[in-house]
């Protein structure tokens, strides 16, 4: 199947990773709203005076408690204001990377003056929806993002509609890389990872550079819940073993600490999430260092991890009640297992054990506590790999795990897509009651 480096399936796999694994500064739900505000502001000639915004319940959930980088403030209003006043409309998920201290001060002043509002979009059939309407005198511009964190579907100003996205364009062309990926299998992904030329996937090493830098930053300071730094102290005190398992736990947690605490460093995201990118990257990096892997082996392991994470997550809603750090960690389990022995059965067993272990962990919004879930998921991934290396795994006789790993994944995703919808509504209701 893989005779040529020009194999079209390889190209689709690589494109899928390039589409879904991107740098992102700050939690991607507030950033999505910041991007809408920045694009709207770019359509205006005058000084921005006010911002009104509307978001879906799921985006509200993931924006209530997370720190916006550089501001020291949490929530969607500061993201909307800073996007409008200091955002780079052309930078996608890095929209806030060049925001100046002056723009941050102006954004805080705009909030204090009561000139920023963020409301629930009701009714709203879209899981991921953000709309920002930015005003300058009598002029205004409104930008709507739907379905993906950077997927702008409409731009309108006081002079009329200037852009609407047509859905038919991509369908008339060839099938999207994600659609192609969803119709393959973990075995085909593994075959690709083993055979693709290194030069074609070298780019994935940037994930190690960016997320490794976040991890180092998390260990330096008191970002977020500073789980990584705290566990490192406990390790030095002899309360935690100084071993590979602990290194995975500490370094992965630290990256998420910095990410959720508002560090002004980008994460390499996966499936629109910085924490998913961290979870799919850092554990694999730590194991690669332990086994002395060179750049090529690290790149192949990271490619397997990120592709597997995308493959699983694509079967889920973009945002749901299921914590997607768990599915990203299933990718990490695949990457770590590949580094340890490379066998498909080891990878499949590790993922099956993950599904039998951390399935059902809820997403209760983006916040500092995400780093707890990231650390739990990373630890579970390594535990599952250790079991698989000894030919032990949760079997198809137990719970939602099936005898086939592909069916196990389908069972997990069915839970998130159907049964957990009421869980999501309940979580949002609880969080909304706390906000009032």
Curated annotation (Swiss-Prot):
Coiled coil: none
InterPro entries: Ser_deHydtase-like_asu, UPF0597
One BP annotation, GO: L-cysteine catabolic process to pyruvate
The organism's place on the tree of life at top rank: Bacteria
Signal peptide: none
GO MF annotations, alphabetized: L-cysteine desulfhydrase activity
Pfam families: SDH_alpha (PF03313)
Recorded family membership: Belongs to the UPF0597 family.
HAMAP family found in the cross-reference section: UPF0597
Protein name as catalogued: UPF0597 protein CKO_04510
Taxonomic source organism: Citrobacter koseri (strain ATCC BAA-895 / CDC 4225-83 / SGSC4696)
């Amino acid at each position: 199947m893989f005779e040529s480096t020009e194999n079209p399936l390889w190209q689709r796999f690589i494109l899928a990773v390039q589409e879904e694994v991107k740098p992102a500064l700050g939690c991607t739900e507030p950033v999505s709203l910041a991007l809408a505000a920045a694009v709207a502001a770019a359509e205006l000639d005058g000084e921005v005076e006010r911002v009104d915004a509307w978001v879906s319940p799921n985006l509200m959930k993931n924006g209530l408690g997370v720190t916006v980088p550089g501001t020291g403030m949490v929530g969607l209003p500061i993201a909307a204001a800073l996007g409008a006043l200091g955002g780079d409309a052309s930078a996608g998920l890095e929209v806030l990377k060049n925001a100046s201290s002056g723009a941050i001060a102006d954004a805080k002043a705009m909030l204090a003056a009561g000139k920023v509002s963020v409301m629930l979009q009701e009714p709203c059939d879209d899981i991921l929806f953000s709309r920002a309407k930015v005003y300058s005198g009598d002029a205004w511009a409104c930008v709507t993002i739907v379905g993906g964190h950077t997927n702008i579907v409409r731009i309108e100003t006081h002079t009329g509609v200037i852009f609407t996205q047509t859905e038919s364009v991509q369908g008339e062309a060839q099938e999207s890389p994600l659609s192609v990926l969803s119709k393959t299998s973990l075995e085909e992904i593994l075959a690709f990872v083993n055979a693709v030329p290194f030069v074609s996937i070298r780019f994935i090493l940037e994930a190690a550079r960016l997320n490794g830098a976040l991890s180092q930053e998390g260990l330096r300071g008191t970002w977020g819940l500073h789980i990584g730094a705290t566990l490192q102290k406990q390790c030095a005190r002899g309360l935690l073993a100084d071993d590979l398992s602990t290194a995975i736990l500490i370094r992965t947690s630290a990256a998420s600490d910095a990410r959720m605490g508002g560090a002004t460093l980008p994460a390499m995201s996966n499936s629109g999430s910085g924490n998913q990118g961290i979870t799919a990257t850092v554990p694999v990096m730590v194991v690669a260092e332990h086994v002395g892997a060179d750049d090529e082996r690290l790149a192949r392991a990271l490619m397997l991890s990120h592709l597997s994470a995308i493959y699983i997550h694509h079967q889920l809603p973009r945002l749901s009640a299921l914590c997607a750090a768990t599915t990203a960690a299933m990718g990490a389990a695949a990457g770590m297992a590949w580094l340890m022995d490379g066998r498909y059965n080891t990878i499949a067993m590790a993922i099956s054990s993950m599904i039998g272990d951390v399935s059902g962990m809820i997403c209760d919004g983006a916040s500092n506590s995400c780093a707890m879930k990231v650390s739990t998921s990373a630890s579970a991934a390594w535990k599952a790999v250790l079991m698989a290396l000894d030919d032990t795994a949760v079997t198809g006789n137990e719970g939602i795990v099936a005898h086939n790993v592909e069916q196990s994944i389908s069972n997990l995703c069915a839970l998130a897509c159907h049964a957990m919808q009421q869980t999501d509504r309940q979580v949002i209701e609880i969080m909304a009651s706390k906000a009032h």
